[in-house]
Amino acid sequence: MKRNYFSILFAFLTPLLLHSVYGQCEGVTLESLSIPGPFSVAALDEEDGIRNGPDYNGATIYYPTNGIPPYASIAIVPGFTAGPSSVEAWGPFYASHGIVTIIIGTNSPIDFPEARAYALLDALETIKQENIRSASPLLGDLNLEQLAVSGWSMGGGGAQRAAVLDPTIAGVIALCPWLPNPDFDHNSAALIFSGQDDTVAPPSLHADLHYEATPVSTNKLLFEVENGDHSVANSPTGGDYSVGKIALSWLKLYVEQNDCYCPLLTDNLLVDPPAASKVEQDFICELLANNSPELALNYYPNPTQDRVYFEIFQELNFELYSPYGQRLQSGQLSSSQPYIDLSTYALGIYYLNIDNQVVKLIKTN
């Protein structure tokens, strides 16, 4: 499995900035990728005043009613002969996590991928119009630099093609895509789901080739669901819910540009995932790592099985964080208790904020 991660951490951080960074990530956990998410959801269609673009046939926009704008957006198109209901589950799911979602029908049920690509671009135009339509509940609430596309089967091939046609698209989610002889020269972060037992778009003839056809300079991920069929990614519940968790993390990371989701992917969801028969990955994201100025205090041992001791001459406040930015403990180091105890935590990397600096601590067995 290819893993290409860029690690960075805040040289010359102020305490305020450090607290801000960790505070933003504190609520980003596997549990936070729930179905549904934290926000209530409402829907709009043409009867509510949204446009019906010339390159698609009918749409529903799902949006959060109590989220925090501005929102990212994603357009989704179904597959060959299929209607919007085939991918409908994605709308409320994304919207409940703060991502406005437009799901469209096609002018013809037998439209090929290129037509579906233009349908997706037209759907994004409808999203843009909602940001300025005076009667829209989304007036002024959309971040038009955070746009993504998705599609099932031929719609998945169309989503990749849409990214070629419009380089401003930030992300692609291809659901068991179908498109022979792919040409995907684009820079949009591409997540490709496939089903191991898909007989309509066999991965070896489609998804695998799509991954290879996506440039090496583009962030990309291929997740093949074990025993999955052609519709295994039509819902966020696919692959024992791993499909939804990975898709949401991908959009949060690359479309919303929220680096808190990097370790959810790199340290958990993509580490020997039980739902996957194959994972290929070549993407860069920012992890919390240790490039701070070297701590003036001596500390040992590191790695450790339990305690890390510090040679201190005055009382110092500390905060210990997980790789996900969750604060695990806080307290004070002193001459009577000059150590951090990791014995109750799982094996792995932890980050200690002490004396306005960050120390990476490693627990081993």
Predicted regions: what they are:
Residues 85-105:
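Short amphipathic alpha-helix adjacent to the substrate-entry channel of hydrolases
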Residues 24-69:
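N-terminal cap/lid segment of alpha/beta-hydrolase-fold proteins
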Residues 70-79:
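Short beta-strand element of the alpha/beta-hydrolase
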Residues 277-300, 365:
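Residue-level detector of functionally pivotal "anchor" positions at catalytic/ligand-binding pockets or at interdomain
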Residues 69, 114-157:
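Gly/Ser-rich "nucleophile elbow"/oxyanion-hole loop immediately N-terminal to the catalytic nucleophile
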Residues 289-319, 335-340:
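Glycine-centered coil/turn sites that cap beta-strands in beta-rich domains
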Residues 185-249, 253, 257-258:
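Active-site-adjacent alpha-helix of alpha/beta-hydrolase-fold enzymes
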Residues 3, 347-365:
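C-terminal tail/sorting-segment detector
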